[in-house]
A protein has these predicted regions:
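Long amphipathic alpha-helical segments
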Residues: 1-80
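Short Gly/Ser/Thr- and Asp/Glu-enriched loop/turn motifs at secondary-structure junctions
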Residues: 14-15, 33, 92-96, 305-308, ...
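A short linear hydrophobic-aromatic micro-motif
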Residues: 87-88, 154-155, 299, 439-444
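Glycine-rich phosphate-binding segment of PLP-dependent enzymes
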Residues: 94-95, 105-131
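Conserved PLP-enzyme active-site core in the AAT-like
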Residues: 133-349, 468
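Structural motif of enzymes handling amino- and sulfur-group chemistry
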Residues: 318, 326-327, 334-387, 396-399, ...
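Conserved C-terminal alpha-helix-loop-beta "cap" of PLP-dependent enzymes
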Residues: 369, 373-458, 464-465
Length: 474
C-alpha cells in the first residue's frame, strides 16, 4: 500500500504570538535580548510559516515541529546571528591592494586606537581651553601638528579630501574662474569628478592645454579679471606617458603669484614623508609642494598618511582664515573620534625613524618579498590540507599595489599563494566560500587562478587566519 501523504498544515493551527512568548524555552532569549526584540523575530518567523502554509509547502507535522521549543530557539538563534552579521566585519585582505577603498583604506596604529577609545568613553577637551577655562578651537591640536610637520603657516581639517576641495573652492572661488590643466580633470571612485565638484562649489572651471600637453603660456593666457586661482590636481590614480608636457608646481606658482593669485594643489593621497626612504617610489610630499610655492595644499588622511578619513588643508594663514569663516566648514567638520585618531597619527610623524614600526600602512607597504615568501612557505601545507582534491595550491611571486589612487603605475614585489581548480567554476565557488567564512577572506581571480597576496597578512594574524581557513573542511 502507498503511504498516505502528510496532512497539509492549516494557518488556523499557528499558535498565537502570546503563547509562544510564554514558552519556557524562550525565557533565556527574552532575558538576553529583551522582549521587544524576540517579539519582532517571532512575528517574522510566524509570517514565514504562514507564507509556507499558503504555498502548500508545510505539513501539519512540520508545523508542529517548527513551533516546538527547541526548533523555535534554533530558528531565533539563527536570526540573531544573521542580524549580527550586518555589522562591519573584520576581513583578511589578500587582494594585493594595501589601501583598498572598499575595505576601509588605512589601518590605524595602536596609538590612534587608544586615542579614539579615550575620546569615546570619557568627556574630552574637544572645544574647551583648559588653561583659560573657556571655549576652545576643535582643530587647534591638529592644526599645530600639521604646521609643525609641514612648515605651513596654518591648517584646517574636514571629514574627507573631497570635502576639503569643495570647501576650499567655495571659499575662494565662488562665482569666479579656476584655471586647471585639461589633463588633470580627474575622476576618482564613485564618479567623483573635479569638474562636478567645482560646479557644486560655485566655481567656474576654465580648462587649459590638452590631455597630454600643457604649457606655461596656456595658464598665462587664460588668466583674466574673473580668475580666482590656479589649481593643480595631482594625477594620483592614472598615468599619462609618451608625448607629454606638464607645468611643474614651482612654475605654476610663479605664474599665479605674478598675477596676484594663489596656487592651490590637490595632492589627493598626500604624504608627509619621502616614500623612497622605505623602498617605495617617490611621491610628492606636502612639504615639497608647499616649498615649491603652493599657497594651499589639500590631501587625505586615510591614504598614504595612514590615519582616519579626513581632508587636510595646509598653507597660507589668510586663506585658511577665509576657509574657516565659511559656514560650510561646520557642516563638514570632523567628529571627536576622527580628530583624536588624526592627532595621534600625526604625532607619530615627529619620530620618522620609527614610522615603519608604528604605522601599519608604511609597515605593510615596506614588507620585503622574502618576508612574504617565508610566510607563504609556513602557510602552504596547512592551507593545502584544507582544500578539496580538485584544487591545487602553490607559492608564487606577485605584485601588490598601493591603492586608493596612489601611484597607479607602481608595482610592489610581493609573494603569496596561487590556487587553481580542475573544475569549471571551481575558483568562483571557492572565492564565494572564503567570503562566507566568519572572518571573510578576499583575494582576486585573474589568469585562471585565485591569487592570495600575503602583503596585508600580519604574521601575528597567521593563527587566526589558519583557523578560518580550516573551516573549509567542514
Amino acid at each position: 500500500m502507498t503511504a498516505a501523504s502528510p496532512t497539509p498544515a492549516s494557518a488556523a493551527a499557528l499558535p498565537s504570538l502570546d503563547r509562544l512568548l510564554r514558552l519556557p524555552a524562550l525565557a533565556a532569549l527574552i532575558e538576553g535580548h529583551g522582549r521587544s526584540r524576540i517579539t519582532q523575530l517571532l512575528r517574522s518567523h510566524l509570517q514565514m510559516l504562514r507564507d509556507r502554509i499558503s504555498a502548500g509547502q508545510l505539513s501539519t507535522p512540520q508545523l508542529q515541529e517548527a513551533v516546538d521549543g527547541p526548533a523555535l530557539v534554533a530558528a531565533l538563534d539563527a536570526a540573531l546571528a544573521a542580524d549580527a552579521r550586518l555589522e562591519l566585519q573584520p576581513m583578511f585582505n589578500l587582494t594585493g591592494t594595501v589601501l583598498h577603498t572598499n575595505l576601509g583604506r588605512a589601518l590605524l596604529p595602536d596609538a590612534a586606537v587608544h586615542a579614539v577609545t579615550r575620546a569615546m568613553t570619557a568627556p574630552v577637551d574637544l572645544e574647551f581651553d583648559i588653561t583659560r577655562g573657556r571655549r576652545g578651537d576643535r582643530d587647534a591640536r591638529v592644526q599645530a601638528l600639521v604646521c609643525e610637520l609641514t612648515g605651513a603657516e596654518a591648517a584646517t581639517v574636514v571629514n574627507n579630501n573631497a570635502a576639503a576641495v569643495l570647501l576650499l573652492l567655495n571659499s575662494l572661488a565662488n562665482r569666479r574662474e579656476v584655471v586647471v590643466s585639461r589633463g588633470e580633470l580627474v575622476e576618482i571612485g564613485g564618479a567623483f569628478r573635479i569638474p562636478d565638484v567645482m560646479r557644486s562649489a560655485g566655481a567656474r572651471l576654465l580648462e587649459v592645454g590638452t590631455t597630454n600637453r600643457t604649457h606655461p603660456a596656456d595658464f598665462t593666457h587664460a588668466i583674466g579679471a574673473r580668475t580666482a586661482l590656479l589649481m593643480e590636481v595631482h594625477a594620483s590614480n592614472y598615468t599619462i606617458s609618451g608625448f607629454t608636457a606638464k607645468v611643474d608646481t614651482a612654475a605654476m606658482a610663479a605664474i599665479a603669484h605674478e598675477h596676484g593669485l594663489p596656487l592651490v594643489v590637490d595632492l589627493g593621497s598626500g604624504s608627509l614623508c619621502d616614500l623612497a626612504s622605505f623602498g617605495l617610489p617617490h611621491e610628492p610630499t606636502v612639504q615639497e609642494t608647499l616649498a615649491s610655492g603652493a599657497d594651499l595644499v589639500c590631501f587625505s588622511g586615510d591614504k598614504l598618511l595612514g590615519g582616519p578619513q579626513a581632508g587636510i588643508i595646509a598653507g597660507r594663514a589668510d586663506l585658511i582664515a577665509r576657509i574657516n569663516r565659511n559656514p560650510l566648514k561646520r557642516a563638514l567638520r570632523m567628529d571627536k573620534m576622527g580628530l583624536a585618531a588624526l592627532e595621534a597619527v600625526l604625532a607619530l610623524y615627529r619620530e620618522p625613524e620609527l614610522l615603519a614600526q608604528r604605522l601599519p600602512t608604511l609597515r605593510t607597504l615596506s614588507r620585503s618579498q622574502d618576508d612574504m615568501d617565508s610566510q607563504a612557505q609556513r602557510l602552504l601545507l596547512p592551507m593545502r590540507s584544507a582544500l578539496a582534491a580538485d584544487y591545487s595550491l602553490e607559492r608564487a611571486p606577485m605584485h601588490s599595489q598601493i591603492g586608493s589612487g596612489a601611484q597607479p603605475g607602481a608595482q610592489l614585489a610581493s609573494a603569496g599563494l596561487r590556487i587553481t581548480s580542475a573544475r569549471r567554476g571551481g575558483l568562483d565557488r571557492l572565492a564565494k566560500r572564503l567570503r562566507q567564512l566568519p572572518r571573510p577572506v578576499v583575494g582576486r581571480i585573474a589568469e585562471d587562478a585565485l591569487w592570495l597576496d600575503l602583503r596585508c597578512l600580519e604574521p601575528a594574524d597567521e593563527v587566526a587566519f589558519l583557523a578560518q581557513w580550516s573551516m573549509l573542511q567542514a
